Amino acid sequence: MESFATLIQNRRSTRKFTERLLSPEQVQLILRAALMAPSSKRSESWQFVVVEDKEMLARLAACKRNGAAFLEGCALAVVVLGNVMESDVWIEDASVASIYMQLQAEDLGLGSCWCQIRNRETEDETPAGEYVRQLLDIPYQLEVLSIIGFGYKGQERKPFDESRLRWEKVHIGKFSLPEQEGGEA
């Protein structure tokens, strides 16, 4: 395993995948990472629907106006759900589980990409979450946060360029704007 610093620098969104399928062991490791993610008060308010069927992946790719087409080409999609009856911070809990899966995938040499569903719409203005709910028979108390696509990388992207880090977004001690600090960032 490479260092965590290298792992997060190398993890980039992958929207093009090869045709190669994931092994059951790889899928299990990705899901294991999600299930090991921390959650508020250990509520574990998340649920996951695993989709490998190519026809269903193609249908999921139509879940919103833009930004979901890559799902049709991935080997695996994990639909990330949160139980609104179990936790008032289901969004945060499900988000942490999602990034754990993405980091595990990167560690395995796989690509991944987050497809935001919550607060998005299909072409015909149906809420994207409702579209996914109907496709996958998701019960009413579960909200769809996202769909994470996984697969072997069909494109290699350069690691994150550290010169692009926006250190002006970091405030020490208290919030202050650059002009409050004498114009320096």
Language model feature labels by segment:
Residues M1-A185:
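Acidic, surface-exposed loops and disordered segments
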